[in-house]
């Protein structure tokens, strides 16, 4: 299990106890700094004060469990307009929206695709309508995905 997934399972109960959805979390390095980025949401959106409240709760859990080696920075925020997509339910929720996905392994010599989410089946296979074709990929093939904001219509 990846460290991000382990962290997700560790902090989810604390976030949900406050009445928020834990959209996802990512652990990465920015220069010499380790960053734990946590995305939280609720119907109607989440504000800065609520993010601070969640941050304090997560910090308390992480201080006790100490799952990250060394120093790190905790960033808690809303997922934003171009929110990341992690689960089949995220894709289902945004059927009809445009997304950008990056595959773990190239398909037809390409790893990045942009298209409209048109379906998600029970086997967690996501279907995207690209410009001129349909792309079907399993969640396990997707390295990273997020919604695309299209302001041009």
UniProtKB/Swiss-Prot annotation:
Predominant location of this chain? cytoplasm
Annotated Pfam families: DUF150_C (PF17384), RimP_N (PF02576)
| UniProt cross-references to InterPro entries, sorted A to Z | Ribosome_maturation_RimP, RimP_C, RimP_C_sf, RimP_N, RimP_N_sf
Gene Ontology biological process: ribosomal small subunit assembly; translation
Keywords attached to this entry: Cytoplasm, Ribosome biogenesis
In terms of domain of life, where is this protein from? Bacteria
Keyword Cytoplasm tagged: yes
Provide a GO CC annotation, any one: cytosol
Where it sits in the cell: the answer is: Cytoplasm
Q: So what does this one do?
A: Required for maturation of 30S ribosomal subunits.
Return the similarity comment.
Belongs to the RimP family.
Return the HAMAP family for the record: RimP (MF_01077)
NCBIfam families noted in UniProt: PRK00092.1-1 (NF000927)
What is the name attached to this protein's record?
A: Ribosome maturation factor RimP
Question: Which classification does the entry list for the species?
Answer: Bacteria, Pseudomonadati, Pseudomonadota, Gammaproteobacteria, Legionellales
Protein's gene: rimP
């Amino acid at each position: 299990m990846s460290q991000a997934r382990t962290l997700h399972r560790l902090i989810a109960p604390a976030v949900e106890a406050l009445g928020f959805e834990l959209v996802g979390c990512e652990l990465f390095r920015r220069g010499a700094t380790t960053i734990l980025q946590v995305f939280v949401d609720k119907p109607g959106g989440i504000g800065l004060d609520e993010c601070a409240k969640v941050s304090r709760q997560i910090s308390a859990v992480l201080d006790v469990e100490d799952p990250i080696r060394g120093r790190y920075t905790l960033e808690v925020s809303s997922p934003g307009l171009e929110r990341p997509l992690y689960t089949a339910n995220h894709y289902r929720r945004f059927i009809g929206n445009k997304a950008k996905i990056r595959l773990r392994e190239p398909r037809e010599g390409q790893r990045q695709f942009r298209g409209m989410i048109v379906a998600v089946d029970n086997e967690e296979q996501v279907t995207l309508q690209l410009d001129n074709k349909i792309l079907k990929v399993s969640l396990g093939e997707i390295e990273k995905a997020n919604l695309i904001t299209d302001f041009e219509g």
